């Protein structure tokens, strides 16, 4: 359903981009390198914040957990705003530099606070108003920056290749998601080691240096990039189409009028017959067929986006209850070495990195071009949703075994029992999020690609927020979730998520077939 329009790009001087000189694989590769560095910083901070809020800023554990969840959720939710700015007012390059700088300033504020004792509460006291102001200003400056960076960088990298070469664009998004996972792997291994052995203040300092280096690397590649000039606010165009269609709702539109409108328009989109009521917007001479097709295409993406939120709600458990489970298991590999709880995601991330590399190196030789179309990405997302349901069922079974051994035999089971659910959830995340990034980029109008690819991250945010709501609702009704896992009914909560995601899978299949 993609709108196929002739794309015009410029170089950094505003002249027409030259094929072979501007854009290409090298320019797209820079986006992958930068994403590795930026995501390592973001996830290292997310991991570090829990200890920082409780040990240094003296917040209670529940308060700190809520602060971290809200920070992560807000960061991903703001990707839709970052994508909107990149599509509407700035080039995607300029949007990255702007939001990357905001993220860096926020990180510098928290780094200074971590090193200056006057900016930290003393003697176990709660932080003062000025201290809290510095903390939350820095924290949400990072969230705004992360939202803008993740909302603009994937589309910028995709622009360097374009959509005509389907194999290359598919390969880019696989390697881009590989970069996301690589950054995550470095965060839960190298950065966790630094935090636990050198200190969280050093972790902040290193994160600041890495992010500054990422921005420098990205800007240094400017001469080889190609840029797409923003086409104005896509949301304004969508609203105008709806307003025009509403005003002309009582007028009759003939097929001849629709064909004439499409013929007179410069739009070269593949016309489709969904949301026919929008055709009435074309009776307004100020509304072009291109605007109507943009609106129609974007609307068709929303059910796919909405069908992935429950899956991300399940993935959110890897950072909450699954971590709690890890704390009450046997994590010792030897007498002197114990696996840090924050590093439990290392093995799943390693599996994801291996799977992505093997798929890109060997899988693409098996698949034909037709299989790598939008239908392939829809199937990929569907497989991810199905695997999520299975993983939640497995998580429930593992929790039953863990609790039985702990309560009846006073034995801590090995932490590697949990790795199965971690691996399965990580693989489902890889299939779904990776599929969404490529699907939304390829299927969206060229003028809305940043905002459309941001839908993938926005789904993650809404999944995290929904997880918080579900925990409150389920616990308020049933009382299943308590501080002591051995007295909780966590396995029943996992089964609730399994059932909800399975119902959601059928909902997704319905919309995917209609697409």
Curated annotation (Swiss-Prot):
Belongs to the major facilitator superfamily. Proton-dependent oligopeptide transporter (POT/PTR) (TC 2.A.17) family. It is a multi-pass membrane protein. GO terms for cellular component: membrane. It comes from Arabidopsis thaliana (Mouse-ear cress). The chain crosses the membrane at residues 24-44, 71-91, 93-113, 134-154, 168-188, 204-224, 298-318, 339-359, 381-401, 413-433, 461-481, 492-512. InterPro entries: MFS_trans_sf, POT_fam. Expressed in siliques and flowers. This is Protein NRT1/ PTR FAMILY 4.1. It is found in: Membrane. Involved in (+) and (-)-abscisic acid transport (ABA) and in gibberellin import.
